[in-house]
């Protein structure tokens, strides 16, 4: 058995859940089993980007004992555009 954590957060609420899973479980399968979509109704675990310890991973990545799966939210603005706006605001 593997013991992993899965985390998801919004600005006002974060959830960290510990799970016991069978060897060979993939990152997407674990996310779907987590039940986080029952806590956050706008969360779609079938398509949400996933990562392990801050690094994006493919859906079929097998988990290792102690992994922390992170469920990422979609970007609200392109990072390059956000930087341009910050620089523009500083110049004004």
Curated annotation (Swiss-Prot):
| Pfam families membership | Ub-RnfH
Q: List cystine links.
A: none
Q: Which InterPro entries match?
A: Mopterin_synth/thiamin_S_b, RnfH, RnfH_sf
Q: Which family does it belong to?
A: Belongs to the UPF0125 (RnfH) family.
PANTHER family xref list: UPF0125 PROTEIN RATB
Q: Which NCBIfam families match?
A: PRK01777.1
Record-given protein name: UPF0125 protein NMB0796
What lineage is this protein's organism placed in? Bacteria, Pseudomonadati, Pseudomonadota, Betaproteobacteria, Neisseriales
